[in-house]
């Protein structure tokens, strides 16, 4: 398994709409395994393939406290949304930024697992929010897109400043 590089906002590749997975092959399973390792390495609770420059409809999520219950969603689709919720969200592709995003409180989701078997599940609370956040990535959408242009610009400027600082540190 390998840790993959996570793209950061405003990288245009994050805006790519992911394509469906035609078949769950050993190559797809390796991508899934690498994504899980990357999610854990980055201390995230979810990761979409788009975030690691793989434009396929693959998401991994683990909201467990023990960090050992990864959920794999291949070609995920939200069948139903119910209620309203929202929490202050963060994102591995927008490091250091958090914002309140409106989401459905509950969702019904259909997907394929790591072995290509179809399953359907109900999600609420943090899992419902995480699923919606990660599926947004597959559509080329980020949580900052829900914010005002001013807030989005502030986040972009902050990330650019952090990037410049890190580059200076590496060159020193």
Swiss-Prot record:
CDD domains (UniProt xref): Pep_deformylase
Cofactor: Fe(2+)
Record bears the keyword Protein biosynthesis: yes
GO biological process, alphabetically ordered: co-translational protein modification; translation
Alphabetical UniProt keywords: Hydrolase, Iron, Metal-binding, Protein biosynthesis
Keyword Nuclease on entry: no
Active site as annotated: 134
Annotated GO MF terms: metal ion binding; peptide deformylase activity
Disulfide topology: none
The record's free-text note on cofactor binding: Binds 1 Fe(2+) ion.
Annotated TM spans: none
Ligand binding (Fe cation): 91, 133, 137
Enzyme Commission no: 3.5.1.88
Gene3D superfamilies registered for this protein in UniProt: Peptide deformylase
Substrates-to-products reaction catalysed: N-terminal N-formyl-L-methionyl-[peptide] + H2O = N-terminal L-methionyl-[peptide] + formate
Taxonomic superkingdom: Bacteria
Function: Removes the formyl group from the N-terminal Met of newly synthesized proteins. Requires at least a dipeptide for an efficient rate of reaction. N-terminal L-methionine is a prerequisite for activity but the enzyme has broad specificity at other positions.
Family stated for the protein in its record: Belongs to the polypeptide deformylase family.
Name of the protein: Peptide deformylase 1
Gene coding for it: def1
